[in-house]
Amino acid sequence: MDGVICDFVGRYKKLFNVNPDQTRNKKEFGNLFNQFIQGQNFATLEMMPHAGELLEFLRNAPVPTEILSSTARQDSHENISKQKEIWLNSHGITFKRNFVPGKQLKKEYAKEDTLIIDDTETVITDWRIAGGHAIWHRDVPNTLAMLKLYF
């Protein structure tokens, strides 16, 4: 979800005046991320540019589509899952939802007949190693072009 259909980075930068990648390896990120969660921000993120086009393509795809999204860690899993459910519902997105307490767990869903769209290179690498197909999302036009090669 984050970085593909909803804009976590944009909201984080707006709230804290810093890119999350600049704080991820610092104690500062944990404190700011906790504030982000407590502010219910995952429920109200802006949609990524052109995400509607991607969602429409996936709604019409000849295969089942599911959401696979990380809740960052176990202690925030329930809270972030609820916020992401609210976001999906408010945008009329009815795909089956799967939430995992850490992006490193996404690979557990990889199978030979699965395809993930994700904006994180490590997720893409892990998914492919686990046997699934993957599209490293950079923007909607490129992702749509890649999807059309599969369908």
Regions found by a protein language model. Give the residues of each.
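Active-site neighborhood of HAD-like aspartate-dependent phosphohydrolases
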Residues: 1-38, 129
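A short, conserved beta-to-alpha structural element at the edge of catalytic cores
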Residues: 21, 27-34, 135-151
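Substrate-recognition element of Asp-dependent hydrolases with the DxDx(T/V) motif
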Residues: 43-46, 51-82, 88
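A short acidic, amphipathic alpha-helical/loop segment
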Residues: 50-57, 109, 123-130
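Short phosphate-binding/catalytic loops that engage adenosine nucleotides
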Residues: 63, 93, 132
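Substrate-recognition "cap/lid" segment bordering the active-site pocket of phosphatases
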Residues: 70-114, 121-124
